[in-house]
Amino acid sequence: MRRLPLDFRDQYFGCEIKLTGINRATAAHALADLFGTCTEHSGGGYDAYRVKDLDGKEWKIVRDSSIHLESRRRSVLTGETYKVELNSPKLEYGEMEKLQEVVRSLRRAGGIVNDSCGMHVHVDASKHTPQSLKNVLSIMYSKEDILFAALKVNPARIDSYCQAVDEPILEEIRKLPSGASMDQLKDRWYQGRDGSDYHYHSSRYRACYGKKAIMYPPFQTLIVQRQKL
């Protein structure tokens, strides 16, 4: 079996985790309490809150309009501030426990998820090659059913925001020669129409999303799933 040219423990990653049940200010203060630091409300279009951990890495709490807001307590009035998305900084494998503690702190603060909530995992692939990306797509395709079942992906998301690998495109990518360039891979991914600068290109709604993989390092793969806090 051919192995990828790098150990996943050597790869950087980051997460976007969507939740509700608490407002953005409460979520930010939960992180600040965990780290023993302060919050900064920078606002803007995403109503961002910033919190640094003890390593100086910045975590963000932002608005995500796709979330269906709710509260655990009926007596609490909810509003747009209850649409919460956590953006982690660039993390190393050894910081997985830190991420877990962050999620636990949000849960203790009252954070919950519903069918509108999901999780994106961004994986650094600056060391990947066109061949290794081909391998990743093939592996994802062969294991998708198992992954979707294990992660309990919402069936509605499989038809919309978390679609399976596009088989015709995968077959075209597989046919590329071993020495294929990143530009050739990009051409197959976008079917001859460069959509790399279009943020909402249809390929972003695949479980394995390679848009930034074939544009510039660091490469990001997005795996979208329903995630319980």
Question: Which residue ranges define each predicted feature?
Answer:
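C-terminal accessory/tail domains of diverse enzymes
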Residues: 1-113, 126-229
